[in-house]
UniProtKB/Swiss-Prot annotation:
Reactions it catalyzes: D-arabino-hex-3-ulose 6-phosphate = beta-D-fructose 6-phosphate
Chain positions recorded as substrate binding sites: 62, 101-106
Family: Belongs to the SIS family. PHI subfamily.
Name of the protein described by the UniProt record: 3-hexulose-6-phosphate isomerase
Species, as recorded: Mycobacterium gastri
Residues covered by the SIS domain: 44-186
PROSITE patterns: SIS
Assigned keywords, A-Z: Carbohydrate metabolism, Isomerase
Top enzyme class: isomerase
Inducing stimuli: By methanol or methylamine.
GO molecular function: 6-phospho-3-hexuloisomerase activity; carbohydrate derivative binding
Length: 199
């Protein structure tokens, strides 16, 4: 225990802990994002704006990040669906499935990719593992060189589980949206008209 632990065993977080860990997260995200191949991301971005609908699928925290990406792509004017939602239609030929799995082996995500492939849809994937089943199914792959969630004690990250992958996934999807938007003359006010008004 450090000074953050009191004599009775209760943990007392102090300001220095937060400062140090903000720096830790910031530096790990910056270092890892800098190692992502921008050409891989550009190929994925071009897949997104091809004709067809966009579907997103991911488990756990990766899935939550892709939900955020789906929201931005909806703001951009694309037709976007989240796999598993009750109103999500069947994927079909010409559509794109955007998936994320740190390991590239998450069973539900791989199964979704296999189903989409059989339907004639395109697959774009984010993963840490270029040799994974998910990467093998994908038409476009972005490798995020972060630790996998089961890689405890990794030299890549001091953070728990798949945190670094999920953080960089968020940053990369935000960069994709920003890059797509940069190539239009659409004002923020127009994007805002698509924002949910039933909140």
């Amino acid at each position: 225990m450090t000074q953050a632990a009191e004599a009775d065993g209760a943990v007392k977080v102090v300001g220095d802990d937060i400062t140090n860990n903000l720096s830790l997260v910031r530096d790990e995200v910056a270092d890892t994002a800098a190692k992502v191949d921008p050409e891989q991301v550009a190929v994925l971005a071009r897949q997104i704006v091809q004709p067809g609908r966009v579907f997103v699928a991911g488990a756990g925290r990766s899935g939550l990040v892709l939900r955020m990406a789906a929201m931005r792509l909806m703001h951009f004017g694309l037709t976007v669906h989240v796999a598993g939602d009750t109103t999500t239609p069947a994927i079909s030929a010409g559509d794109l499935l955007l998936v994320a799995s740190g390991s590239g082996t998450t069973s539900g995500v791989v199964k979704s990719a296999e189903t989409a492939k059989k339907a004639g849809a395109r697959i774009a994937a984010f993963t840490t593992n270029p040799d994974s089943p998910l990467a093998g199914l994908a038409d476009a792959v972005v490798i995020i060189p972060a630790a996998q969630k089961t890689d405890h004690g990794s030299h890549i990250s001091r953070q728990y589980a798949g945190s670094l992958f999920e953080q960089v996934l968020f940053v990369v999807t935000e960069a994709v949206f920003q890059s797509l938007w940069d190539h239009t003359e659409v004002e923020a006010e127009e994007l805002w008209t698509r924002h949910a008004n039933l909140e």
